[in-house]
Every structure is written in structure tokens, then in C-alpha cells.
Amino acid sequence: RDRSVSRGLGDVYKRQQYDGTGPDCIRVCFHKSQALQAVELCRKIKDKGYKVYFQPMVALSYSDAEYLGLIGMANKFRPDVFYIVDSHGSMKQKDVARFFYLIENNLDKEIAVGFHSHNNLQLSYSNAQYLAALHTDHNLIIDSSIMGMGRGAGNLNTELFVEYLNETADADYSTEPILCSIDNTIAPIYLTTSWGYSLSG
């Protein structure tokens, strides 16, 4: 059995009801073949009082009909966030638009929309800008990491995206703590465990 969705299940099933302390959300990532198993897991997590971030990996592997089926299941068990996941960093803007509008027109408005991207084609930043500019009736969550820290090609850079939001969306994020984190913590890690675009794979 693929371990992606089952990793850590023992901890989930052993967890007591959420008591208001510690992490309050659990991210459930799964491949298409694991959708029913993932939905059942999400229900159990919700029953224990945790928030659920529903992340069907490799969105591009789904047809419109299959993705609409996922949305229909989500409308029934009601995760806190339904994610568009670009696992291979291969989404172009037209792909982001396709999945966004399937969600926008069919997902319950009380469920937030998330976007989790990898940066293989160096499009995480432009795709995030595109999403942020769209009108939506949902709350929108866009994942990022400082200095793009992440597996393989890495993820959307927090320091770039918050500056973009400050300039275009009347946001008021302070970039100084982020830059200090880069200098003091993240950059030294990068020297020994690098990530990012590479022709050598």
C-alpha cells in the first residue's frame, strides 16, 4: 500500500479529542487511488476537533469529472481547506485557472481554497500572483516557505510573495523578520542541504 496517506495514521487514530492546545490542523495529502481512504481519514480527524487541510496531490492527474467528484465528497465532509496541489511544479496559468474555476463554481463557499505549488518550472510566483488577483467567494490560502525551502525544486518564496502583496493588495507584512530568518537560520541550512531548480535533477 502506498505510504503517503497512511504515514502517521497511528498517531491520528490514537489522538485524543483536540483540547485547544498545540497544533490544531492536520494536512491530509493523498494520491488519486487513495481518495476514499483519505476522505474517511478526514472524517475521523474532523470528529476529533481538528481542522483538516484536504490536499489531493498531482492535480493534473485528474480529469474535470474526477476533480468534481472530489469536490462533491468535500462538500459532504467539509474540510476547512480544499487545495489545488501542483506536486510536480508543472502547472501553467491555464491549468491553475482550470482547477480554480472548477472549485469556485462547485465547492461550498464556507470551505477555503488553498494552493500548494512546487517550483520546477519557476512558475510558483507567477501562478500565485494570478490566483491572488482573481475574484473569489472563498477565503484563499497560498502556501509559501522562506527562501522557497522545500523538497526538490522548492516552493513559493515567502519573502517575494509578501512583498508582492504589500505592493498590490494593501497588505502590511513586515519583511524584516523574514530576511533575518534567512540570514540567521535558512541560509546556513541551504549551504548543506540545498533545494531549488537544477538541470542535473
In which residue ranges do the predicted regions lie?
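Single conserved hydrophobic/aromatic residue that forms the stacking wall/gate
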Residues: 2-13
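Active-site-adjacent beta->alpha loops and helix N-cap segments on the catalytic face
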Residues: 31-48, 60-67, 89-103, 153-158
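Short hydrophobic alpha-helical runs that function as membrane-insertion/retention elements
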Residues: 27, 53-54, 140-144
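Short, acidic/polar
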Residues: 11-17, 64-72, 124-128
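Catalytic alpha/beta core domains of metabolic enzymes, predominantly
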Residues: 81, 85-192
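C-terminal extensions of enzymes
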Residues: 193-201
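Catalytic beta/alpha-barrel core
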Residues: 24-35, 55-60, 81-91, 114-116
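Acidic (Asp/Glu)-rich catalytic clusters
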Residues: 14-23, 39-49, 71-78, 104-107
